UniProtKB/Swiss-Prot annotation:
The IMP cyclohydrolase activity resides in the N-terminal region. It comes from Alteromonas mediterranea (strain DSM 17117 / CIP 110805 / LMG 28347 / Deep ecotype). Keywords: Hydrolase, Multifunctional enzyme, Purine biosynthesis, Transferase. This is Bifunctional purine biosynthesis protein PurH. Pathway: Purine metabolism; IMP biosynthesis via de novo pathway; 5-formamido-1-(5-phospho-D-ribosyl)imidazole-4-carboxamide from 5-amino-1-(5-phospho-D-ribosyl)imidazole-4-carboxamide (10-formyl THF route): step 1/1; Purine metabolism; IMP biosynthesis via de novo pathway; IMP from 5-formamido-1-(5-phospho-D-ribosyl)imidazole-4-carboxamide: step 1/1. It comes from the Bacteria. One of its GO terms (biological process) is 'de novo' IMP biosynthetic process. The keyword Hydrolase applies. One of its GO terms (cellular component) is cytosol.
Amino acid sequence: MQTPKPIKRALLSVSDKTGILDFATALHNAGVELLSTGGTAKLLAEAGLPVKEVSDHTGHPEIMAGRVKTLHPKIHGGILARRGVDEAVMEENNIAPIDLVVVNLYPFAATVANEDCTLEDAIENIDIGGPTMVRAAAKNHKDVTIVVNAADYSRVLAEMNDNNGSLTYSTRFDLAIKAFEHTAEYDGMIANYFGARLDSTGCEADCDHQHSEFPRTYNIQLTKKQDLRYGENSHQEAAFYVENNIQEASVATATQLQGKELSFNNIADTDAALECVKEFEEPACVIVKHANPCGVAIGNDILTAYDRAFKTDPTSAFGGIIAFNRELDAKTAHAIVDRQFVEVIIAPAVSDEAKEVVSAKKNVRLLACGDWAGQLTEGYDFKRVNGGLLVQERDFGMVEMEDLEVVTKRKPSEEELRDLMFCWKVAKYVKSNAIVYCKDGMTVGVGAGQMSRVYSAKIAGIKAADENLEVAGSVMASDAFFPFRDGIDAAAHAGIKAVIQPGGSMRDQEVIDAADEHGIAMVFTGMRHFRH
């Protein structure tokens, strides 16, 4: 069993000074000698703490405008020295051991996220001494503790208090892992930034070149949120990893209020439902089954929206995922638990009364994800293929009503335009080939994932007929263009009065002529929404 190691000397050098003064004060009160640099040393000294500048400790001043501060044998020897092995070398070179290193790095990510950031700005925010100390301390975690996150300050102090000023090996090892993760993420961000600037080679300062969105090598770091019982199928091992520092309301950041542990498929389906419901400003409900919306509706309140969404396809809604864009209230919660079996309910917030209602069904997973008003976080989608990874920008595209191009003789009415926009938002989240029928802010039929677009149209009609929903007078959305007129003919047979689609087929005119023959109004968006 490893013996806890006492903390007698600490080196503190942080860019993010959150909590550092209180932490340093507690260390001082525990009898720890404080070494520090630059702004951190200034902050501690101004607070009256007895802090020793690194330059005084090494006998060598900071040079090159602070570029060289801690890169000195007395610092790295003190960190890397193996206790019980290197004492003679330390004594010969007048090196004192450093037991605790507290470092976080220059804010490179925040710097390059600024649209006014120049190449020189980025270069000056590449930390050199910090990562070197972090890696040295993490390497020598047998004897040295490394802290890179202010969230761990209280943990360190609590353990020191319980162990007479010492820290256990398990804590040092865990913090060392965090340190290596921290430097890996940091170096990955730098590599991504410079890898996307390959055409700027030779620029002396900054340049006006158009840089690639995608670097030569792509580095990402995710943190495991939980192990899962299994993957998409029971014979597959799985875990859920989340992006670091994500701020957007999402399934990754949601708080589970009750219910069984989320499964792999629960998480995937909940993401599909939540991202779809985010598209709507009015109170809305989205019900998802196997990653496809099977019912979507808006209403004056979420209870009305849920009632209407459920009516689209009550059969498929069984065991589905339900997402709302308003707080879940008790009336809506009652309607759900009294009516159907549901796997997951997710909403921005959940009232106390709604929590009590849902608690009667203890297995239902209830999630609160927070508000997303105005959020559109930049980012990428990833799709693994054997031996590689497809990377693309997230699909934030959505046309406005005024951008629609009317291509038929008959123009859609104002009511039809509203339904067309609603239907287009739903189609964006239906697996291709996607055909969606909608009427009065409610889906009446969804045809998803067919190899032939006309069969998706037929299935949407069949689904509506199965639930005794009236298609006549509805509108239709297609996630991509119609390659032939047969999809329009099928829509006309079902009673569709208006169509929204991207356009762009070689046979667009044939499709337009078909719509005119049937008296159907049709608009082009100029934007496709394939979803695979």
